[in-house]
UniProtKB/Swiss-Prot annotation:
Gene3D superfamilies: Glucose-6-phosphate isomerase like protein, domain 1 (3.40.50.10490), Helix hairpin bin (1.10.287.610). It comes from Clostridium perfringens (strain 13 / Type A). InterPro entries: Ribosomal_uS2 (IPR001865), Ribosomal_uS2_bac/mit/plastid (IPR005706), Ribosomal_uS2_CS (IPR018130), Ribosomal_uS2_flav_dom_sf (IPR023591). The lineage of its organism: Bacteria, Bacillati, Bacillota, Clostridia, Eubacteriales. Belongs to the universal ribosomal protein uS2 family. This is Small ribosomal subunit protein uS2. The gene is rpsB. The keyword Transmembrane does not apply.
Length: 233
């Protein structure tokens, strides 16, 4: 029984690639055919590759390591946040700030600032400050929350894998993962370079349902791995 069925992939539109003029020739092995100027992805390959990625993510989770979900394009933002939260993992879904992993000490000072502002809002400090200052602080908090809210509890040294939607868009995140030797699992569309990724899941990275389906399977793998870790203890 495969982790993901052909029926699920078809229903979510995972097979629709990009226009033929916008392709990366390295994706040729994952392309089934061309239809009306659009490449159709070979879903048999997707089934197999999704299974490999699932097993890897499950092992990472079972070993007690964390996974960071990265998807900042509009179609990915919600699914990345929801599935990371469901599996109790970390996510970046608005903007990858340079050094998020490779210069975590600097990022940590901004996370501390966000925590401080959260505290001020909760303990009533905002109620006694001048209105103008509160507006300024709330705007600062919103911006920090948007960029760092998904990694507030992150321990960068315990990241065992990165799951990415659209490696072309998230090249900075992938570059940092490479520097730190963190394996990358990604939904790779027909316009991407599969060689940038350790575990390629060939598929449509522009359809909300397609992203949700695959991100959801990665979250399932994490949850299954965590259960295995608890059983081993």
């Amino acid at each position: 029984m495969s982790v993901i069925s052909m029926k699920q992939l078809l229903e979510a539109g995972v097979h629709f690639g990009h226009q033929t003029r916008r392709w990366n020739p390295k994706m040729a092995p994952y392309i089934f055919t061309e239809r009306n100027g659009i490449y159709i992805i070979d879903l048999q390959k997707t089934v197999k590759k999704a299974e490999e990625a699932y097993n890897f993510i499950r092992e990472v989770s079972e070993a007690g390591k964390d996974v960071i979900f990265v998807g900042t394009k509009k179609q990915a933002q919600e699914a990345v946040k929801e599935e990371a939260e469901r599996s109790n993992m970390y996510f970046v879904n608005h903007r990858w700030l340079g050094g998020m992993l490779t210069n975590f000490t600097t990022i940590k000072t901004r996370i501390n600032r966000l925590n401080k502002l959260d505290e001020m809002e909760q303990d009533g400090t905002f109620d006694v400050l001048p209105k103008k200052e509160v507006i300024k602080l709330k705007l600062e908090r919103e911006k920090l929350q948007r960029n760092l809210g998904g990694i507030k509890e992150l321990d960068a040294s315990n990241i065992g894998a990165m799951f990415v939607v659209d490696p072309r868009k998230e090249k900075n995140a992938i570059a940092e993962a490479k520097i730190l030797g963190i394996p990358v699992v990604a939904i790779v569309d027909t316009n991407c370079d599969p060689e940038e990724v350790d575990y390629v899941i060939p598929g449509n990275d522009d359809a909300i349902r397609a992203v949700k389906l695959i991100a959801g399977k990665m979250a399932d793998a994490i949850i299954e791995g965590r259960q295995g870790e608890q059983l081993a203890e």
